[in-house]
Every structure is written in structure tokens, then in C-alpha cells.
């Protein structure tokens, strides 16, 4: 697994639609909670000491000092382009042979994916794009249980 640092931007955690670990100011110290789901303006936070709390996002948004999301980064190593092309093809964004070699068609398909997901269109497999691509199938989502 890989770790992506969200900074203090909860909107990014919501965009990724994956449970996140948030560090929040509590007096002079920080506490750690899990952002389990967001529905509308409400979020379920799980605190190891206080248990589950459903709170309006606006009540704790400015208290967040850092956040991280763990994701399975399949796009490392020699076969990263091959896996990327397969994933883009499965999503209907890449209609060409899967070769494992990056080119303008792969870049164009990746830009379509980035645009669809609200990411900056770079055509590069940056970390934010890898997080969004990993958010498939069995990956947990920010939805109520």
C-alpha cells in the first residue's frame, strides 16, 4: 500500500471517496480520527476514545491539520504502463491495443480520466491520479455502512 498526504484539505478526501485518517487540533495537541463517510454536509468520524460521531463537516473542517489516505498503488515498477492501459481500457477510455508503451493515445486517455474525475489534466500518472484509479472494486468508499 501507498500513503497519499491530503494536507488539511477535507474536500480532497471527499473527492477521493475513500476513508481517510485525519489529524485534528484538540487544544494544544492533535488527535487522530477516521473519516468513514460523508453524506451531504455530514460526516461520520471514528475516534478511538470517543467512538463514532456524526458531525456537520463545517464544525471540524478548520480543525484538520493533516490527512492521509492509504491506497493500493498498482502503478509501480516495469508493468505500470501496461496496467494503466488495461485500467483505462476497462473504463472505456482507451480503445487501442494494450502494449505497455506510453504514447500520445495513453496520455489522451489519461487526460480524459483526469477530466472526468475533476483532477488537473496533465496526462501524467501522478499520485492523485493513481489514488483515483485505485479506487475501484473492493476499495472502501466514503458511504454509510
Q: What is the role of each PLM region?
A:
Residues 11-14, 64, 86, 95, ...:
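Alpha-helical context
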Residues 76-80, 89-135, 142:
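Short acidic, glycine/serine/threonine-rich helix-capping segments at coil-helix boundaries
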Residues 145:
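Glycine-rich phosphate-binding loop of ATP-dependent small-molecule kinases
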Amino acid at each position: 500500500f501507498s500513503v497519499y498526504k491530503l494536507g488539511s484539505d477535507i474536500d480532497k478526501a471527499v473527492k477521493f471517496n475513500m476513508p481517510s485518517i485525519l489529524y485534528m487540533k484538540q487544544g494544544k495537541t492533535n488527535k487522530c480520527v477516521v473519516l468513514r463517510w460523508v453524506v451531504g454536509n455530514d460526516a461520520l468520524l471514528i475516534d478511538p476514545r470517543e467512538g463514532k460521531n456524526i458531525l456537520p463537516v463545517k464544525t471540524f473542517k478548520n480543525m484538520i491539520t493533516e490527512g492521509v489516505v492509504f491506497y493500493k498503488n498498482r502503478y509501480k515498477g516495469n508493468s505500470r504502463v501496461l496496467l494503466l492501459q488495461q485500467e483505462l481500457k476497462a473504463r472505456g477510455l482507451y480503445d487501442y491495443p494494450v502494449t505497455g508503451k506510453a504514447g500520445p493515445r495513453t496520455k489522451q486517455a489519461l487526460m480524459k480520466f483526469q477530466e472526468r474525475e475533476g483532477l488537473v489534466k496533465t496526462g501524467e500518472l501522478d499520485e492523485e491520479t493513481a489514488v483515483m484509479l485505485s479506487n475501484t472494486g473492493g476499495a472502501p468508499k466514503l458511504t454509510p455502512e
